[in-house]
Amino acid sequence: MDLMSFKEREISKKDCVELFEDTENFFDILKLADSIRKDIVGDTVTFVKNTNIETTNVCTMGCKFCAFSVSKNSPEAFKLDADEIAKKAVIAKKSGLTEVTIHGGIHPDVDTHFQVETINKVNSATSKLGGIYTHAYSPQEILNGAENAGLSIKEALKMLNEAGLRTIPGTAAEILDDEVRSDICPLKMSTKKWIDIMKTAHKTGIKTTSTIIYGHVEEYKHIVDHLSILKELQEETGGITEFIPMSFLHENTPLYKSGRVTDGASGLYELKLYAIARILFKESIKNIQAPRVKIGTKLSQLILKSGANDLGGTLVEDKVSKAAGSIYEDASVDLMKNAITSIGRIPKERTTLYEIIE
């Protein structure tokens, strides 16, 4: 296989699967991805000062890869109201953060009107401090909110956009293959519905991130199909700001407890996935994130040498990762910068939309 030819030409799904299966040219594949990264985004590695605000741990989805959710009647259940969420956003702003990511489980009582109220109260509460960027609500949360409010997806997104929502997390993608979804998250939306909501968001003027959860029951072909869907979506709408692979954190999850999965992805698999994503995406999705809070500093640094160019957020609160067994703590700005400079790259703080903060 002529690896260097992939630097100039499109790579097919068949080629991508063959790269996953190729064990002899492992380091050459990583080197190619890193070279493409350098050509497209240079040596800058970005990060964002942010926090997650988990609005509720109640969820009706019952996903087998999740260790965070509980039922509505559980003694451990919580649900923040709009004022409580706004207070957390104020604390984030006073702490010098630039972004709050607001998300939670799929609660049966949450609708679009509550989501709009939350956005309005966060914006109002933080405005006197200069405001904070609100990145909120996955496609599944938007679908749940719209259905509970009796609205179409288009109507719900329009209301959220008018309230000031400019970006949403592209989570709930998991693996964009309905056979796999019927196994690990059977109650979640179909692949087509996820794509439709993302397209509608982009057409409404709301940009999104994009994600994948890997290292569970998927096969290489599922990963490649997923990446190809994201590339096609981006080429159609241009609304994706970044790609965030999320390694399956197996401990405490139903998949692990059932014995079907004994471990998450290997380090070699993770590096290969990032590299192939960069080789496939090239300039279509320029920003690829190595989420340090989920995988740790050392693996993140290796991933930055395998096609990635972003270290993610400081994530002052990430209950989902910690519930699933993540051993990594919140990252300070100094830790982020040191992780970047120690591999010979240039750290830059960014906004949610990848604007550099000097």
UniProtKB/Swiss-Prot annotation:
Keywords: 4Fe-4S, Iron, Iron-sulfur, Metal-binding, S-adenosyl-L-methionine, Transferase
Cofactor note: Binds 1 [4Fe-4S] cluster. The cluster is coordinated with 3 cysteines and an exchangeable S-adenosyl-L-methionine.
Residue ranges of domain Radical SAM core in the record: 45-292
Residue ranges that the Swiss-Prot or TrEMBL entry lists as coiled coil: none
Cofactor list: [4Fe-4S] cluster
Signal peptide: none
EC number: 2.5.1.147
Catalyzed reactions per annotation: 5-amino-6-(D-ribitylamino)uracil + L-tyrosine + S-adenosyl-L-methionine = 5-amino-5-(4-hydroxybenzyl)-6-(D-ribitylimino)-5,6-dihydrouracil + 2-iminoacetate + 5'-deoxyadenosine + L-methionine + H(+)
Molecular function GO labels: 4 iron, 4 sulfur cluster binding; 5-amino-6-(D-ribitylamino)uracil--L-tyrosine 4-hydroxyphenyl transferase activity; 7,8-didemethyl-8-hydroxy-5-deazariboflavin synthase activity; iron ion binding
Pathway: Cofactor biosynthesis; coenzyme F0 biosynthesis
Alphabetical list of Pfam families matching this protein: CofH_C, Radical_SAM
SMART domains named among the record's database cross-references: Elp3
Binding-site residues for [4Fe-4S] cluster, renumbered to this chain: 59, 63, 66
InterPro entries the record matches: Aldolase_TIM (IPR013785), CofH/MnqC-like_C (IPR045567), CofH_family (IPR019940), Elp3/MiaA/NifB-like_rSAM (IPR006638), F420 (IPR034405), FO_synthase_su2 (IPR020050), rSAM (IPR007197)
EC main group: transferase
Domain of life: Archaea
NCBIfam families per record: CofH family radical SAM protein, F420_cofH, PRK07360.1
Record function comment: Catalyzes the radical-mediated synthesis of 5-amino-5-(4-hydroxybenzyl)-6-(D-ribitylimino)-5,6-dihydrouracil from 5-amino-6-(D-ribitylamino)uracil and L-tyrosine.
Stored HAMAP family: FO_synth_sub2
Quaternary data: Consists of two subunits, CofG and CofH.
Family, as annotated: Belongs to the radical SAM superfamily. CofH family.
Stated name of the protein: 5-amino-6-(D-ribitylamino)uracil--L-tyrosine 4-hydroxyphenyl transferase 2
Name of the gene encoding the protein in the UniProt record: cofH2
